[in-house]
Amino acid sequence: MVNFTIDQIRAIMDRRENIRNMSVIAHVDHGKTTLSDSLIQRAGIIADKVSGDMRYMSCRADEQERGITIKSSSVSLHFEMPKEDKLPAGCTSHEFLINLIDSPGHVDFSSEVTAALRVTDGALVVIDCVEGVCVQTETVLRQAVAERIKPVLFVNKVDRFLLELQLNTEEAYLSFRRAIESVNVIVGNTEDKEFGDVTVSPEKGTVAFGSGLHGWGFTLGRFAKLYAAKFGVPEDKLMGRLWGDSYFDATAKKWTSNPQSADGKALPRAFCQFVLEPIYQLTRAIVDEDAVKLEKMMKTLQITLAPEDAEIKGKQLVKAVMRKFLPAADAILSMIVTHLPSPLVAQKYRCANLYEGPMDDECAVAIQKCDPNGPLMMYVSKMVPTSDKGRFYAFGRVFSGIIRTGQKVRIMGVNYVPGKKDDLFLKSIQRTVLMMGRKTEQIEDCPCGNIVGLVGVDQFLVKSGTITTSEVAHNIRVMKFSVSPVVRVAVEPKNPSDLPKLVEGLKRLAKSDPCVLCYSEESGEHIVAGAGELHLEICLKDLAEDHAGIEIKTTDPVVSFRESVSEESSIMCLSKSPNKHNRLFMKASPISMELQDLIEAGSDISSKDDPKARANYLADNHEWDKNDAMNIWSFGPEGNGANLLVNVTKGVQYLNEIKDSFVGAFQWATKEGVVCDENMRGIRFNLYDVTLHTDAIHRGGGQIIPTARRVLYAAELTASPTLLEPIYLVEITAPENAIGGIYSVLNRRRGIVIGEERRIGSPLFSVKAHLPVLESFGFTADLRSHTAGQAFPQCVFDHWASIGVVNKDKKATEVALATRKRKGLAPEIPDLDKFHEKL
């Protein structure tokens, strides 16, 4: 069954130009896991018979039951390229190692996709040809391009065109073309010079078509090969002719771009005539049971069926014949090997995105060259639970050097700063393993460019981190998730004596999922926060069954809010220190929505930028005063949030002495706003004037920190404080007769429809709407009951929107008071007099 050994795989691991690291990404239910089956079966890991139904990559019981992927899982495939195929540039051997990661398509788990993308260099994007590009396809594609990952495309479920919708060849072509165009629109609008052009097109060979369930697929190269001999035209020339507006005029025996022949007849498009027509004919012959025609075609195409397939009929026979004619795995694996980059190529342009340190230190140079003799640099992107309760494999990618069993390494957590001792551990690796879907295989060592699991480092890392042997190494950048944990529940054990188990379980849960947040409130509640309802449900199930192993009670889901302001402070706020010797003057004003999003994305502007470059950027693009922009003291909360502390004072003595205390107070205040203890977002605090005591002893941290916090709160309260709630972008696919039901459900839940369009070539409509997360609980069930189960919603976190001004608008005030009550704070929103003082 397995036709390669671990030693063979280990041998290829050293040939970096023959390695391909790739992930399979797509919208939910577009057939990633089923397609991965065909590829794994080609490598001989599972038997031919069960391929397509087995879902080898779904390792968990609940994944098998629900039929969705929840965690990404990885497998290493050994692929031998056919001898007659042209080898990619720089390769000398026909044997390749493909590390394939199957990732979830459901939007709630897109943090799993991010973790998978970080350790790979290429992505196989799967699209359902009937549904086209959906919300989640768009999200993951954007993420892939941002991580500088090269896509190739597989248009899946073509069998539905033949057997279910019965479209003619021209309609099928138009449908394919539209799907490919929408992918190119998403990946094409990046202006990344080093990364180059990443658009996909069939004539380049970066698009394959087929059916994952039936196990057949092809690229244009396959047909170009068939016809090259017949027409006497070289293959690569023919590939360009088999797509787009090119037609073959049989009477004049020449190619033309004119859809009419010399004598005025309409010509069929080359793609329809030479590629789709044979497939349609073959399928039709089987479905109509036309044995004579079938035999003749099979003879021409040199297809011979196995003896045991002689008796089958109908769809099963279609599957058997098409698999022999166009095996999917061969087409896709050669596309991956030919068009996706090896670590050697990819790390050159990915290094700048990955590494936080300077681009000329030893680690950066080793990463760019993918150098096995350089210092070890490995990024751990997630933790994978082992069969041994409570222990995890650290799953990641080696970017340079070699990692060995028993090697002493430096384990650096997310908060590690070079030169300091925090979040740094010196430990040795217990074992290195190869991840093979449901199993793991032990290996001695693993050279750079490969994906590997480690045993024995899980106690030192929370979710992700960097492992290195170099003393000067900086961290590899933290991943940016497209979803944020906005839905929270409080958990408690049914039996109070189980509390220690719950706490231990929460720690393990936080490790096992890249996106989940576990923390305790001051009121003593334990909170679990997730990206959405489904994500939370899976996390709680894991917590009860695996991580804690106890029965738990949960509260209703609650939503996180953000506090913001809507105008500049109405008065200059003043606070005096407890000893009355120091005075701080401050105002607050809102930051534009656009700038808030940029800061949170961390791409164009972040706290780590060079202050001068940042000031120029703000002055040119966001109409900031250059002097103000130079004097940004801090971003908050956590040192990177979307609130700014700006020093606009003129000629104040001793100001630098209190800067650290002030920044500390700012981080504290922005983490717990005054309205209801939620994070602040989008507030710019301007420090106008400071009067300090001349004696250093009277202006220590104990005097400044509480005063600064009070003046920050006063500034927020005088600037019309608002509450922001998270909003989902919902995409709903449904037939026409269900549209009415969708609208009524959305209206009841404060949803706003922003667009509806018909999917060409299919009977489905797609409706896009904005829906407050607060109203989204039970939305799916409600929607299904109103549309007789025909509507499928997908929710993805989109933006923050204001509910209204606190103490003016009824809704905002109610929400604020309810949140205060839930957190056990004083029932009323504090008065301004508590914070603002008279001169």
Curated annotation (Swiss-Prot):
EC number assigned by the record: 3.6.5.-
Residues the entry annotates as binding GTP: 26-33, 156-159, 211-213
Modified residues (Diphthamide): H698
Protein location: Cytoplasm
Keywords, alphabetical: Cytoplasm, Elongation factor, GTP-binding, Hydrolase, Nucleotide-binding, Phosphoprotein, Protein biosynthesis
Annotated NCBIfam families: small_GTP
Reported function: Catalyzes the GTP-dependent ribosomal translocation step during translation elongation. During this step, the ribosome changes from the pre-translocational (PRE) to the post-translocational (POST) state as the newly formed A-site-bound peptidyl-tRNA and P-site-bound deacylated tRNA move to the P and E sites, respectively. Catalyzes the coordinated movement of the two tRNA molecules, the mRNA and conformational changes in the ribosome.
Protein name: Elongation factor 2
